[in-house]
C-alpha cells in the first residue's frame, strides 16, 4: 500500500506522529476533531463521517484514534487516479455528536492534539533544504481564524492565511515558528534533522555572502585600476607625464609599472598612505578627462 504514494518530507514527519502516545480521552477527541475539520465530510442521514486522506501515516493514526474511541470503521478504500499525487485513502467511520462538543481553542493540551490532527490530515511541510514553509488546508473560515489566534496566544506563532478558490490555507514561514509548531505536536526525531539542515543553510549562506563580497570587491578594484591606467595613458599620449607635477608624476609612473598592486601597496612603495595615493590618482584622472573619456 505504501508504494502507491510518494514518500515526502511531510510524510516522514507524519510517520513519526503516528506513534505519539495518546493522552486523555478529551485529547484524543480533539485530535480526531482536527481530522474532521481538515478532511472530514459528515453524512447526517447515515450518521457516518467520510475522511479523504492523502497520507497513509495519517490513515493509520486515524484508525488508531477510532479504535481507542471504540468507533467502528465501516469502509477503507484506496482511490486510484492517473495522477499519482491525487491518490488518496477514503475511510468511512461511525459519527458521534461527542466529536463536535470539544472546544480545543481554550486549553493548550486540547489545542496541541487538535493541531496534530489538522497537520496529519490536511498539513504539509516543504523540505527545509529548499525553503521554509508549513501549511494546513482548512475549509471553515471560523476554524481557521480560531486556530491562527490560538497559535499566537499559546505559542507566539505568527501564521498567515491565504484564500484560494476551493479552500483556505493557514501557513507559517518562519523556521523558528515552524520548529515550535512541530515540537508542540510531538515531533522529536525530525526536529534534529531540521536543526542540522537550518545550520547547514546558514553556514552556506554566510560563505556565499562572503564570496560574493570578495568577488564584487575584486571587480570594483579591477575596474578602478583600469580607469587609472587609462587616465595615465591619455596624459602620456597628449601632454607627456613629464609635464605633471612631480608628486603626480611619481604616482603615475609607479602605477604603470605595478598594475596589479592595491592602493595600500602602492603607498608603501612611495611612503604614502592609501588615502594620499587615492587622492593623487583622482587628480590624475581629472587631468586626463580633458583629453578623452576615462572609463
From Swiss-Prot:
DNA-binding region: 262-293
Keywords from the named record: Cell cycle, Cell division, DNA-binding
Gene3D superfamilies noted in UniProt: Homing endonucleases
Keyword Cell division tagged: yes
The keyword DNA-binding appears for this protein: yes
Origin: domain of life: Bacteria
GO-annotated molecular function: DNA binding
Signal peptide: none
SUPFAM superfamilies attached to this UniProt entry: Homing endonucleases
GO annotation (BP), single: regulation of sporulation
HAMAP family: HTH_type_WhiA
Domains (record comment): Contains a degenerated N-terminal LAGLIDADG homing endonuclease (LHE) domain, a linker region and a C-terminal helix-turn-helix (HTH) domain.
Function: Involved in cell division and chromosome segregation.
Family assignment from sequence similarity: Belongs to the WhiA family.
Name of the featured protein: Probable cell division protein WhiA
Amino acid at each position: 500500500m505504501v508504494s502507491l504514494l510518494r514518500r515526502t518530507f511531510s510524510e516522514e514527519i507524519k510517520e513519526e506522529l503516528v506513534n505519539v502516545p495518546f493522552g486523555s480521552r478529551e485529547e484524543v477527541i480533539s485530535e480526531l476533531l482536527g481530522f474532521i475539520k481538515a478532511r472530514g465530510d459528515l453524512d447526517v442521514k447515515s450518521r457516518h463521517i467520510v475522511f479523504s486522506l492523502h497520507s497513509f501515516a495519517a490513515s493509520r493514526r486515524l484508525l488508531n484514534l477510532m479504535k481507542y474511541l471504540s468507533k467502528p470503521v465501516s469502509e477503507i478504500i484506496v482511490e486510484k487516479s492517473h495522477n499519482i499525487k491525487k491518490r488518496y485513502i477514503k475511510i468511512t467511520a461511525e459519527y458521534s455528536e461527542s466529536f463536535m462538543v470539544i472546544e480545543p481553542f481554550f486549553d493548550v493540551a486540547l489545542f496541541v492534539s487538535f493541531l496534530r490532527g489538522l497537520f496529519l490530515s490536511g498539513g504539509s511541510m516543504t523540505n527545509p533544504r529548499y525553503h521554509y514553509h508549513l501549511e494546513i488546508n482548512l475549509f471553515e473560515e471560523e476554524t481557521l481564524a480560531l486556530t491562527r489566534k490560538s497559535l499566537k496566544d499559546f505559542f507566539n506563532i505568527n501564521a498567515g492565511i491565504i484564500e484560494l478558490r476551493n479552500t483556505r490555507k493557514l501557513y507559517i514561514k518562519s523556521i523558528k515558528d515552524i520548529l515550535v509548531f512541530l515540537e508542540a505536536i510531538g515531533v522529536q526525531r525530525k526536529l534534529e534533522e531540521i536543526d542540522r539542515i537550518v545550520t547547514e543553510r546558514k553556514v552556506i549562506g554566510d560563505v556565499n555572502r562572503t564570496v560574493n563580497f570578495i568577488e564584487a570587491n575584486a571587480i570594483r578594484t579591477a575596474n578602478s585600476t583600469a580607469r587609472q591606467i587609462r587616465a595615465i595613458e591619455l596624459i602620456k599620449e597628449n601632454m607627456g607625464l613629464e609635464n605633471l607635477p612631480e608628486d603626480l608624476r611619481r604616482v603615475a609612473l609607479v602605477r604603470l609599472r605595478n598594475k596589479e598592486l592595491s592602493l595600500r601597496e602602492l603607498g608603501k612603495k612611495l611612503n604614502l598612505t592609501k588615502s594620499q595615493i587615492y587622492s593623487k590618482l583622482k587628480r590624475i584622472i581629472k587631468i586626463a578627462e580633458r583629453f578623452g573619456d576615462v572609463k
